Amino acid sequence: MSSHILQVQNLSKVFETENNRFTAVDSVNLEIHGDEFFTMLGPSGCGKTTTLRMIAGLEVITSGNILFDGQDFNKFSTFQRNIGMVFQSYALFPHLTVFENVAYGLHIRKVSKTTITELVNHILDLLVMSELASRFPPDLSGGQQQRVAIARALVYNPGMLLLDEPLANLDAKLRVQMREEIHRIQKDLGIMSIYVTHDQEEAMSVSDRLAVFNQGQLMQVGTPHQVYAKPQSLFVSDFIGQANYFPAHITNRNGSGVQVTLTKGLELELTSLVTLNKDEVGSIEPNFDGIVMVRPEHLSLSTSDSASLSCTVRRIMFLGSYTRYIVNCPDSRNEVFVDSPRPISGIEEGSKASIGIEEPDAILFHKGNS
């Protein structure tokens, strides 16, 4: 197991032109430990790749520090940082065999031929690619080319592995296979890995922890479950998974929880509270307005009028392991998504129905918006 520690401290990157100044990364703080598989997730232009490039030494830092095992990375070139990198473009040499592509970095490092042979054969065995050693990149599938790029990044035993959208050029089924392969290899080697993607399912499936970025800012860091179940902003709740939103009015403070009323009079007792204005933490009081967020699996549909919120079922989608109901509800900001592990008897497209909310899993966002 790796004992390395990467610390990113108040990291910022500003791009300046004659007429413009753009902050791509704004005061980001991160700490990544040992053999973590850590993912930086966010929409295009959010700053995740720029952060990765600064860690790699491919982008000049405007301000802040990057420390690896206490050493200031700013004092080392990309080559000296001992980092393995895999990018969206595999950048394989078409005139070199798989073996020669993997060995290329070792030749640059002036490693002996005997050691090169041992190291390359070992990494090809680990990636189950030994039989491809004499083939050329144009003769390989996309997944095989990706494995070659990974082998080349790992063969010299780097201190950390950086992966920037490495599966973007693969089809959907192969992406799933390769992300599991990357996760297996990473855990087998016990190497710290930092993975950049905009694909939330990809991030959730492979990460020990993930960081959600938006507009250059770090919005939240946590395990996939923490970020999904306890989002700390409306942006994170919307970007990670599907979310439903209901305008609410706070009517009573009750210990650590609150009582809220939705627009049609439904009362809820909630204990999961998020203050959106960080200057007002703990100041929630009656008569404030807020937004209740509920995941689709924590809603239920019923033909009974007593369930709570009235709605009309617009669309029913059977998605294999669950059935998704898309309903129109005047109490919600948008269409409401309800996920059920099995089809609900008596509910059809066009049906009138009622929505029930699982209160322990609902979150109240209050004081402003994000």
Where are these regions (language model features)?
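The feature captures the beta-strand-to-loop junction immediately N-terminal to the Walker
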Residues: 41-43
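Conserved ABC transporter NBD signature motif
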Residues: 64-72
